[in-house]
Swiss-Prot record:
This is Small ribosomal subunit protein uS3. One of its GO terms (biological process) is translation. GO terms for cellular component: cytosolic small ribosomal subunit. SUPFAM superfamilies: Prokaryotic type KH domain (KH-domain type II), Ribosomal protein S3 C-terminal domain. Keywords: Ribonucleoprotein, Ribosomal protein, RNA-binding, rRNA-binding. GO terms for molecular function: mRNA binding; rRNA binding; structural constituent of ribosome. It comes from the Bacteria. The gene is rpsC. Pfam families: KH_2, Ribosomal_S3_C. Part of the 30S ribosomal subunit. Forms a tight complex with proteins S10 and S14. InterPro entries: KH_dom, KH_dom-like_a/b, KH_dom_type_2, KH_sf_prok-type, Ribosomal_S3_C_sf, Ribosomal_uS3_bac-typ, Ribosomal_uS3_C, Ribosomal_uS3_CS. Residues 39-107 form the KH type-2 domain.
Length: 231
């Protein structure tokens, strides 16, 4: 039987790049990798209301640069920047190096796969019907510019005795086209009947040429200039 590969891993260095961007040798590699995992876990668990999509970590020289992509940056920054300074101090203690924080606003959370998956998971926890949650997410994504979207939910859907997988798709989602800009994410909904897994694929158009940093750069430019990035 065929198996679906991870769309992000398949497109690394084509139109996607890594979320951890640094180089290390020997035991330093394991130490930095563990630090990255701790940083991401701490940020996501302590800022659940910020709607965080991803955390990008770069380590030039002795500096640790952390970029947080979130739909609600105000929750991270806090009143007069007090909360972000506390976060920076905590991360500096965890890593033992100088930390620079950069907050990037996600202007269209409806077409961000991680936020869509987490939104569906939150609705399932609140006992919203899974078909209604999936259809609502699909319609919102298409309305805001996605060319195609597919959502799958797997588990004891609706409290059924036997677990199954249900999916809903609209538009094009060309997983075999490497130049396709496919945004993919997973989430879990911990319900009274057990864990339900959610997977989301969003097709945002094709990226011609070899530019792994294209999407990240457009989002950073939009943050500083106030102009929304093109699909």
């Amino acid at each position: 039987m065929g198996h679906k590969s991870n769309p992000i891993g398949l497109r690394l260095q084509i139109n996607r790049t890594w979320d951890s961007r640094w180089y290390a040798e020997g035991r330093n590699y394991a130490q930095m990798l563990e630090e990255d995992l701790k940083i991401r876990k701490y940020i996501v668990e302590n800022l659940p209301q910020a709607a965080i999509s991803k955390v990008v970590i770069e380590r030039p020289a002795k500096l640790c640069r952390v970029s947080i992509y979130a739909a609600r940056p105000g929750v991270i920054i806090g009143k007069k920047g007090a909360d972000i300074e506390k976060l920076r101090s905590k991360l500096a203690t965890m890593t033992g190096s100088d930390v620079k924080l950069n907050i990037v606003e996600i202007r269209k959370p409806e077409i961000d796969s991680k936020l869509v998956a987490q939104g569906v998971a939150d609705q399932l926890v609140r006992r919203v019907a899974f078909r209604r949650a999936m259809k609502r997410a699909v319609q919102s994504a298409l309305r805001l510019g996605a060319e195609g979207i597919k959502i799958t939910c797997g588990g004891r859907l609706g409290g059924a005795e036997i677990a199954r997988v249900e999916w809903y798709r609209e538009g094009r989602v060309p997983l075999h086209t490497l130049r396709a800009n496919i945004d993919y994410a997973e989430a879990e909904a911990h319900t009274a009947y057990g864990v339900i897994g959610i997977k989301v694929w969003i097709f945002k158009g094709e990226i011609l040429g070899h530019d792994p940093m294209a999407q990240d750069r457009l989002m950073m430019e939009a943050q500083t200039s106030g102009v929304r990035p093109a699909r």
